[in-house]
Every structure is written in structure tokens, then in C-alpha cells.
Amino acid sequence: MSFRLRYAPSPTGFLHIGNTRTALMNYLFAKHYNGSFIVRIEDTDLARNVEGAIESQFENLNWLGIYPDESIFNPNDQKYGKYMQSQKFDRYKQLAEQLVDQNKAYRCFCTSEELEKDYEDQTSKGIIATKYSQKCLFLTQDQIQKNLENKKEYSIRFKVPKNKTWTINDIVRGDVSFDSKDLGDFVILKSNGVATYNFAVVVDDYDMQITHVLRGEEHISNTPRQMMIYDAFNWNYPMFGHLTLIVDNTGKKLSKRSGNALFFIEQYKKQGYLSQAIFNYIALLGWSPPGEQEILSQNELIKIFDEKRFSKSPSTFDMVKMKWINSVYMKKLDDDKYLEFVKSFINTNKFDITSKSETWLNHLLLLYKKELEYAEQINDHLDLFFNKNTLDNNTIDVLNNLTNYKNVVEIFKNQINVLKDWTIENIKQIIKDTSTLANVKGKDLFMPIRIFATKSEHGPSLADVIYLLGKTTVLNNINSLER
């Protein structure tokens, strides 16, 4: 059997961590078994569809390295039908009417007001799990015909079998059972002719010969309704699997309101995360590789993927770990690719890099290669080289706690003043000579030099920073602070 798995987004929003994880796990599952990964669009909720959402979904999937074998852009319509639900209305209607003819579904002429009153009556009686009253199930043929002649609007409801239990061997959770007594007759075709989610998704999965349905746990409650529809048509079920929730650091479901994490993939792109790093990290949400290694390429993940290693517990989205993994991938870039990538994230409205040579800028950016968690972070470090810094009270307190810092600075300044050949090696030698002449080392040596020469407590290699700032700037910094 050739495995066929799908990711089926609705164009009601943009690609985020949750549906990226769904797409990615289906992709790994399919590719591990040399199967097919399909992307189809569930766009029947016309009122909520967002312009540009479909294009954005595909653009971001491709950016992550997730390329569908079949989609609206590379369909196999002749064999598997359409890849957008809005192009299958006739198919859904024909199958819904077929179930009516077979007495497995029926026309419901109840208005929304009647349904609302019915549910309110049930709630007032203490019924929590309200169900449809089946009022229209018992209409006579004459009553039905009269309603049709009067052009009364109707939906089509599925007739839930009585006293039946369905059990699935969930890929993630093991055996899960559902009882028909917990479910009321549900709509499969709305009065406007649009199929409901549970009906359309079954038809689509059957038409596309989907073998495994791997999705979020919020869909567990949909599964029994879908199994009933499979049974009604005498179709075989796919294998079902329901991935556990992704939660934020407070234990709540990750969402765009989660303050500690970026939610949308587009946000990561704009901040300068690498697609390979995001793919790697999201693959670890609710799934664990064998062994201790966590930095894994797409090909490695495909090779070692095992559906038995899904977690049954919620996975916590850890922004610190996401940043760490991205920093590992940043370090792995060769210097040319790193420079090209990071330069594209420099805020040129704030920092005039055109006034500097390419050699100077490359030297500066490479100083931070081992420090950056994401590319846009470079802007946090550039004030040191482009803007005039001022010392805060904390930095002044640091100086006052050092041994004889004024003497250290004076010795260093005098040597810098007479330095003719401005090289990193010569600057390192001056720092070394200052240590000997002032009889200090460690923090008592480096901190006063760094603060006075660069006007900052922190930074990368001191000699490199001094070299990049230039002799004039370094002496101006020292003189301004001495005053």
C-alpha cells in the first residue's frame, strides 16, 4: 500500500506553529514511507476566507522546505478530484442526496429560530450535551413534499445509528472509543448547499485515497461523525492519529495571544530565523527522535521518523530552545552565506552602513556570528559602532569597584596615542603592555579599557572592537569620559 497523507488548511488565516506542526508531521510520515504528501484547501467557510491566505500558506510551506506532491498547483484531478472544496459542491450534494435516498440521512426544514428555541429548552432542563430533537426525521412523505413545493429551505441531517460504538486505534493515543448515544443527528449539507466540515472532509479523503489522517487533538470529537459517514457509504476508514496540544509556558494552548512566543511563521521570517532551524524545532514538538541528538536536518528527520514516538502529553513551546536551535544553524552557515543573510536584516534607516567599507562591515558582522540567536538581533549590537553611547549609573558603579582604573586608562591611552600602525595585533600588544605597566589583569584590566574606549560594558573581542571603532573614535571616547 502506498501511503497518502494530507494537510488541509482553511484559508481563514496564515501559517502558524500549530498548523505548521500538522503539515510537517504529515510530510515526514509520508516521506519516510516513500508515500505522497498532499495539500488541499478547505475553503467552504466563504465568509471567513482571508484574501492572500492560500498563497501565503504555500509560500511559507515552501520556505520551510515542505513541498507537496499534489496540490492546487500540481493536481491530479482526473484520479483524485478537485483540491479545493469550493470546486466540489456538486459532488457533496450528490452524495448527501444519495444518503437521503438510502434513508441514512433526511431533510431538516427547521429554521434557525426553531433550533435555537429547542436547544434553549433542553438547556433549561439541565441537559448539557444538547442534541437535535429529530423533529424532521418523523415527517411524512406528504409533509416533505409539501415543504418542497413551497420551496421551504432545508438542510440535510445524518441519521446517527442507535446503540453503536466505534473504536479507533489512534496512531498517537491507542484505542479510543465513541458511543452513538452521545451524539445527535448532525447536518452534512447546509441550506445554502455548502457541505459541512465533517461531511466534506470524509468525501475528500475518500476521493483522494488518503491512508492516514494525522491532525490536532481538537478533531477527536469529529472522528465518530466521520466514521459514521464512512460506514454509510461502505468506505474503509483511514488510520487516524491526533497530535497533542502545543502549549505556551503558562500551560495554555499556544496562540497569537501567547506573550512569550512568536505564533506565525511569517514573524520568524521577518526576524531572521532560518527555515531549517524552524523545521528542526517544530519536528520536536510532540515527537522525539531516538538518542540524544536534537540538531537534525530534514533528511535526517525523514530517515529516523517513527510514528510510534509521538508523545501522548502536551508539548511546551520553548522560545529559548527555538532561539538556541536557530543560533546553532546560524553558526553552521559558511561565512559568505552568513554575511549575505545578516546584512539583509540591518536597519539601514538607523545605521548608515554605506559610510563603511565592505571589509569593515564584514569584520564587524563576523564578530557576532557566535552570539546571534536570529539575524535581526544584529541591530541590538550596532549602536556601539554607529551611534554615540552614554554611560548609565550602573556602569559608573562598576568602574568605582575596580582597582585603580584611572591609571589603567591613562597608560592605555598614552600607548594608543603614539600607535602608528593600527592593527589588531598591535592593539592586543598594547592591552598586554598596559597589564604589565599597571600591574593589573582580568576584570581590573579589561573592564576600564572596554568602558572608556568603547563606552560600553559589553561586546565581543575587545581588540577587534577597538580596531573597528578606529583610533580617533577611541581617543575621543576616552577623553570625553575623563572629563
Curated annotation (Swiss-Prot):
Chief localization: cytoplasm
A GO biological-process term: glutamyl-tRNA aminoacylation
E.C. no: 6.1.1.17
Intervals of motif 'KMSKS' region: 253-257
GO molecular function, one term: glutamate-tRNA ligase activity
Amino acids binding ATP: 256
Superkingdom: Bacteria
A Pfam cross-reference name: Anticodon_2
InterPro entries the record matches: aa-tRNA-synth_I_cd-bd (IPR045462), aa-tRNA-synth_I_codon-bd_sub2 (IPR020751), aa-tRNA-synth_I_CS (IPR001412), aa_tRNA-synth_I_cd-bd_sf (IPR008925), Glu-tRNA-ligase_bac/mito (IPR004527), Glu/Gln-tRNA-synth (IPR000924), Glu/Gln-tRNA-synth_Ib_cat-dom (IPR020058), GluQ/Sye (IPR049940)
Protein name as it appears in the record: Glutamate--tRNA ligase
Provenance organism: Mycoplasma capricolum subsp. capricolum (strain California kid / ATCC 27343 / NCTC 10154)
